[in-house]
Amino acid sequence: NSSDLAFFAAEKAIKDSKINQESLNYIIVAHNFGDVKKVTKQIDQLPSLASRVKNKLGINNPDCICYDLIFGCPGWIEGVIQAQAFIKAGMATKCLVIGAETLSRTYDIYDRDSMIYSDGAGATIIEKKSKKINQGILSHKTCTFSSENTYDLFLGDSFNPKEYSKDRYIKMHGRKIYEFAITKVPQALKDCLESSKKSIHDVKKIFLHQANEKMDDAMVNRFYKLYDLPRPENIMPMSIGKLGNSSVATIPTLLDLVKNNKIKNQSLKKGDVILFGSVGAGMNVNAMTYQV
């Protein structure tokens, strides 16, 4: 289940960060379908996945607040943005943000789009640091386009006319989403970068939601075109060929791979300025500038 994968990712994040898990103020789990048991398509979100993760971790502190975030594929980035807001407001010093999904239990086997869907989870600790340290989130940008694009991604019937079950499956208007993404995401990245006061030449990596390699290529190319610049080599790490599209989990799992030098010619070092960007159901778009 998604909550199991979220727990495994959370354990690793807590271990890597060397924090005391009882000191966490918030656990935020971004997902879209909750836990979905085998042989059924029923979505289970009661209790929240965040509460289930807290229970599995064995955290006893009642002041560790848990909630789920339903925001489409950009959910993990939005969770990080919310965690930063809590810290800035003095409501938290440490937050655990997880993106987890089991799309293998929600897709239509008769839909060719389903072959790229996968399961996964990625977790991060967002922690308050000294203002003197020039690291962390520099800027962010979020938009929801719900006038004409609300139902570009939706739950619908199987493409198999002989499928008479009442189950609903992930469906999308693929071409419409593609055109939307390659327009809105590059602009969000640009707006976000300009808010950070960093130059386009400072950007070392761009981490995009792994929905479609062709679409991600187009988004990055258009982003650099906004600056009348060619796209730098190795600027965009990719994992979809290996891990598929796990929705909210694609960016945190991709970040983990690059951070641990698991992708050829892709690495990060202290001081690097990186961009995150995602697009998904809503339709939601967000971006974040971060300094390692």
For the regions a language model picked out, list residue spans one by one:
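Claisen-condensing/thiolase-fold acyl-transfer catalytic domains that form or cleave C-C bonds
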Residues: 7-10, 36-43, 47, 68-88, ...
